[in-house]
Regions:
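Acidic, metal/ion-coordinating pockets
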Residues: 1-261
Length: 261
């Protein structure tokens, strides 16, 4: 089966890129399921029920999160009831929502695990030990398991790929908004890429308007960052081919579409 995984969707430009491109990519690559990171989809910070539903209408089947997933007030209530939106599993157990989920695609159960790194990130529980328990639980239901590690450090993401190699179908990184060129299938059959990149505005600084970002670097303070609204858009992600019976990855190809009006 072919899976499309999409990097951090940033604000309305990112959601518009989904509307324009996901259906075309699904047709072009014969995609059976699409998973996207949506923690920046609402105004660049967080997610709302409305923006989540908009992503689903654009062809996304399942949404993962990260350190901004709770930025919008009352989104925890939606997380508690939604079966297709998850947050990092290594948040404290009292946090709203779940860190894993499953959905059906082309007659196959697809398991999804969302984790958050600890290097240069807000404090959370150990993602490696958390992965051990939750991957074992998901494997009771399906061999096809996709892991989104939302993390800053490339080394932590590479380490997680090696750690889960042979136990999951794919480990991809999110958070930095910059796509890496290290996609591969690891020896145990796990597809890996350190970071999928960003789906959102091409201009600005990793999705944000450049002015306040430059002020922050030059003066140490600035106005609140806001999404770059003008200019071209981009969509970043990867297509992963998985053997549905074994859960082993057969290939991974980067996707980077630029110049989306």
């Amino acid at each position: 089966m072919n899976l499309l995984v999409v990097g951090d969707v940033v604000g309305s430009p990112g959601r518009e890129a989904l509307k324009r491109c996901v259906s075309l990519l699904r047709e072009q690559h014969q995609i059976h399921a699409c998973i996207a990171n949506g923690e920046n989809a609402a105004g660049g910070f967080g997610l709302t029920a409305q923006t989540a539903e908009e992503m689903f209408e654009s062809g996304i089947d399942f949404i993962t999160g990260g350190n901004h997933i709770f930025d919008k007030r009352d989104f925890g209530e939606y997380l508690e009831t939604s079966k297709r939106v998850i947050r990092p599993a290594n948040y404290p157990p009292t946090a709203p929502g779940r860190g894993t989920g499953t959905f059906e695609a082309n007659g196959v159960t697809v398991g999804v695990l969302n984790l958050m790194g600890r290097t240069f990130m807000p404090p959370v529980d150990d993602p490696f030990r958390c992965a051990d328990a939750l991957v074992a639980d998901l494997r009771k239901r399906t061999p096809v398991i996709i892991v989104d590690l939302h993390a800053e450090a490339t080394s932590e993401k590479v380490a997680m790929g090696r750690y889960l190699d042979g136990r999951v179908s794919c480990v991809f990184g999110t958070h930095t908004h910059v796509q890496t060129a290290d996609e591969c299938v690891l020896p145990g059959g796990t597809a890996f890429i350190s970071d999928l990149g960003m789906t959102g505005p091409t201009d600005g600084v990793i999705g944000m308007d450049a002015g306040p970002v430059l002020d922050r670097f030059l003066t140490g303070f600035s106005d609140r960052f806001s999404v770059q609204k003008s200019g071209m858009r981009q969509l970043c992600g990867a297509v992963v081919t998985v053997d549905a019976a074994s859960g082993k990855a057969e290939g991974i190809k980067r996707v980077f579409l630029r110049g989306i009006a």
